[in-house]
Amino acid sequence: MYAIIETGGKQYRVQEGDTLFVEKLEASKDDVVTIDNVLAVSKDGSLTIGSPIVEGAKVEAKVVEQGKGKKIIVFKYKPKKDYRRKQGHRQPYTKLIIEKINA
């Protein structure tokens, strides 16, 4: 059994027990979050596709940690001029473990 969910503007294929890194959610460690945006559910060999979401389907996940990704460097410059800008960015994420798929 698997489901396709949407969170943070991205889509993920999940099964029970999967570990997932998603865009930051407003939840603290060990909280259980419910994701209602279930786009499709496969159960016993049959695929149910929502339009746009499957009614009554939910995915429950436990928050394992909140963190930041690796740092990326953004460097802008203009040649032959004295213009240089260096900026770093670390994207915040939430690590989830999928506990249950209700369909």
From Swiss-Prot:
It comes from the Bacteria. The keyword Magnesium does not apply. GO terms for cellular component: cytoplasm; ribonucleoprotein complex; ribosome. GO terms for biological process: translation. The keyword Manganese does not apply. Coiled coil: none annotated. InterPro entries: bL21-like, bL21-like_sf, Ribosomal_bL21, Ribosomal_bL21_CS. Keywords: Ribonucleoprotein, Ribosomal protein, RNA-binding, rRNA-binding. One of its GO terms (molecular function) is rRNA binding. Part of the 50S ribosomal subunit. Contacts protein L20. Belongs to the bacterial ribosomal protein bL21 family. NCBIfam families: L21. This protein binds to 23S rRNA in the presence of protein L20. This is Large ribosomal subunit protein bL21. The gene is rplU.
